[in-house]
């Protein structure tokens, strides 16, 4: 997946504050609301808020807009809406519980089972 400049800036900002297990998902084919979802782990509320703050500063410095931020007061799960990119900053237990990566992952092709043949009738 080729990342646009906004997504690359977001990932760089999260890496600078030591965000854990950064996952970037291309969700263009699943929703018309946004193109890219980024999920990042935080070790604490404090780190979660720092990740969110760093992300917002870097995006604004790029000249892009931050459309909204939810959950910063608590810090357990912070959502940062950047328009075409949505970033979820989550503490590990919350991330594991909601498992957004699997929920938004592209569907895997199902393996087909061979059909059982009907047994021949004895003569």
Task: Go through the PLM ranges and name each one.
Residues 1-29, 43-50, 57, 71-72, ...:
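Long, contiguous binding/interaction regions
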Residues 34-36:
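Short amphipathic alpha-helical segments
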Residues 54-58, 62:
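Conserved short hydrophobic interaction patches
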Residues 61-69:
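Active-site phosphate-binding and catalytic loops of NTP-dependent enzymes
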């Amino acid at each position: 997946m080729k990342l646009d400049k906004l997504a690359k800036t977001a990932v760089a900002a999260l890496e600078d504050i030591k965000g854990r297990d950064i996952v970037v998902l291309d969700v263009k084919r699943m929703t018309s609301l946004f193109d890219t979802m980024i999920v990042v782990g935080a070790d604490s509320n404090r780190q979660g808020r720092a990740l969110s703050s760093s992300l917002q500063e870097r995006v604004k410095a790029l000249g892009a807009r931050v459309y909204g931020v939810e959950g910063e007061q608590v810090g357990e799960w912070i959502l940062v809406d950047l328009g075409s990119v949505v970033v979820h900053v989550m503490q590990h237990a919350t991330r594991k519980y909601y498992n957004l990566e699997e929920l938004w992952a592209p569907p895997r092709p199902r393996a087909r089972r061979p059909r059982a043949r009907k047994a021949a009738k004895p003569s």
